[in-house]
Amino acid sequence: MKKLALVLLCIFILMLPSTVSAERKIPILIYHSIDEFKGHGVEDLYVSPANFEKQMIYLRDHGFTLLTFEQWNDAKNIDKPIFITFDDGYKNNLNAFAIFKKLETNHFKPKGTIFVISDFVGRSNRLSWLELKRMADSCLFSIQSHTANHPDLRKIKDYEYELKVSKEKIQRITGHPVIALSYPYGLYNDKVLAETKKYYSFGLTTIPEPFIEKGIQDERYLLPRLYVKYSTTIEDFAKLVDNK
């Protein structure tokens, strides 16, 4: 009887998931400009509209669910969650908006998060408040904060303006909650984290890896992101989102 119990115990232990296999990797992608690169600026901060559409089709055809940070807690109940983010609020993000509308069906609901620099809104190459409002109301995009002026947050003193005023301005225009901050240049320190926690529920870095929940302190304020570049092929993209 003891021998049988020991055998059953060993079988039970072998059936338990290992720590490594139990780790759930959630990709959070970062884009900037959705446009053809015309020789100005940094090439790998662009992704062509054609490539972006192919990437979204890949996600659709491979069973991914695109989420915004308002849906963070839903991720644990979804088989293949992914977050699509755009930094800086460039006007060419309207290309992503058009592609999302084109691909949206009853079975595929594309969603993305645009992190805008609130004092830059309305500049010639940036989205206007009217455009941001329209995107937010479509429920295809969540509009969140990339601060007021895009400073290195480690070197400033007026956190209230960069974090609180930026948040309030975006909320007032879009009519939707602002709960996430993208750190300019991906830079932060303990002071930045402490100030961010006063106004936001999430902080996003540019640490190049998928998110793995580890239960560490300030985990939601240290969210990593994976860059999608102009040079990213669809094969590269597949490896990126499938964590290969």
Region spans (language model):
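Positively charged n-region of N-terminal signal peptides that target proteins for export
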Residues: 1-4
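C-terminal active-site subregion of NodB/CE4 polysaccharide deacetylases
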Residues: 22-85, 90-93, 154-244
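Short, well-structured secondary-structure segments
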Residues: 27-30, 65-68, 83-84, 106-124, ...
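Substrate-binding clefts and substrate-entry loops adjacent to catalytic sites
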Residues: 144-157
